[in-house]
Amino acid sequence: MPTINQLVRQGRTVEKINSKSPAMQNSPQRRGVCTRVYTTTPKKPNSALRKVAKVRLTNGFEVISYIGGEGHNLQEHSVVLVRGGRVKDLPGVRYHIVRGSLDLQGVKDRKQSRSKYGAKRPKKA
C-alpha cells in the first residue's frame, strides 16, 4: 500500500490491454485485396486442409484470414471484407473473411446457420 506522497510522486500505472485484432484499428470490418489464397494444416490433434487467404487491407496491414464454409470462389486480386475472430487451431490466423460480401460468394445449398455463410433463404418447393 503506497503512501499519499509516493502516489503524488509516481501515480498509478494503467494496465495496457492489447487488442486481439490490431489490424482492424477498432473497426468492425475492413476491406482488402487477396494477395495469396492457399491451404494450410492445423495444429497437432487436428488434421485438415484449412482454406486461408493473405489479404492486404485498405489501411496497409497484411493479414492472414480464414475462409469459412464449404467451397469458395476466391483468387488473387479478389476484393473481400475482413472481420475479427481467430481460428484456434491455425497459429497466426486472427481474422475471418465475411461470406456473401463483395467478391466472395455465400455457401451454396446451405440450410442452417445461413446468415454466417451469406446464403440466401431457399425457395419453397
UniProtKB/Swiss-Prot annotation:
UniProt xrefs under InterPro entries: NA-bd_OB-fold, Ribosomal_uS12, Ribosomal_uS12_bac
Gene symbol of the encoding locus: rpsL
Descriptive protein name: Small ribosomal subunit protein uS12
Disordered: region residues: 106-125
Positions carrying 3-methylthioaspartic acid: 89
Keyword Ubl conjugation: no
Keywords: Methylation, Ribonucleoprotein, Ribosomal protein, RNA-binding, rRNA-binding, tRNA-binding
Residue stretches of biased makeup (Basic residues): 113-125
UniProt subunit comment: Part of the 30S ribosomal subunit. Contacts proteins S8 and S17. May interact with IF1 in the 30S initiation complex.
GO biological process: translation
One term of GO molecular function: structural constituent of ribosome
Similarity comment: Belongs to the universal ribosomal protein uS12 family.
GO CC entries: small ribosomal subunit
SUPFAM superfamilies: Nucleic acid-binding proteins (SSF50249)
Signal peptide location: none
PANTHER family named among the record's database cross-references: 30S RIBOSOMAL PROTEIN S12 FAMILY MEMBER (PTHR11652)
Reported function: With S4 and S5 plays an important role in translational accuracy. Interacts with and stabilizes bases of the 16S rRNA that are involved in tRNA selection in the A site and with the mRNA backbone. Located at the interface of the 30S and 50S subunits, it traverses the body of the 30S subunit contacting proteins on the other side and probably holding the rRNA structure together. The combined cluster of proteins S8, S12 and S17 appears to hold together the shoulder and platform of the 30S subunit.
